Amino acid sequence: ECRWFLGGCSGGQTCCEHLVCHRKHQWCVWDWSF
């Protein structure tokens, strides 16, 4: 199960496709890929 946009990604949870965990805020943000 992946984390959607702006979903919390602390604790080793992985973000969904084209998303990356923001190190400072600890939520999933777009990685600028398509």
UniProtKB/Swiss-Prot annotation:
Record's keyword terms, sorted: Amidation, Calcium channel impairing toxin, Disulfide bond, Ion channel impairing toxin, Knottin, Neurotoxin, Secreted, Toxin, Voltage-gated calcium channel impairing toxin, Voltage-gated sodium channel impairing toxin
A single Gene Ontology CC term: extracellular region
S-S pairs: 2-16, 9-21, 15-28
Pfam families linked: Toxin_12 (PF07740)
Organ and tissue specificity: Expressed by the venom gland.
InterPro entries attached to this UniProt entry: Huwentoxin-1
SUPFAM superfamilies reported in the protein's UniProt record: omega toxin-like
Record bears the keyword Iron-sulfur: no
A GO molecular-function annotation: toxin activity
Free-text description of this protein's post-translational modifications in UniProt: C-terminal amidation is important for the high potency of the toxin.
Domain of life from the UniProt record: Eukaryota
Subcellular location: Secreted
Main location: secreted
Presence of the UniProt keyword Lipid biosynthesis in the record: no
PTM sites of type Phenylalanine amide: 34
Other remarks in the entry: Negative results: does not show activity on voltage-gated potassium channels (Kv).
Known role: Inhibits sodium channel Nav1.7/SCN9A with high potency (IC(50)=117 nM) and Nav1.2/SCN2A, Nav1.3/SCN3A, Nav1.6/SCN8A and Nav1.5/SCN5 with weaker potency. Also inhibits voltage-gated calcium channel Cav3.1/CACNA1G, Cav3.2/CACNA1H and Cav3.3/CACNA1I.
UniProt remark on domains: The presence of a 'disulfide through disulfide knot' structurally defines this protein as a knottin.
Family, similarity comment: Belongs to the neurotoxin 10 (Hwtx-1) family. 54 (ProTx-1) subfamily.
Protein name: Mu-theraphotoxin-Df1a
Taxonomic lineage of the native organism: Eukaryota, Metazoa, Ecdysozoa, Arthropoda, Chelicerata
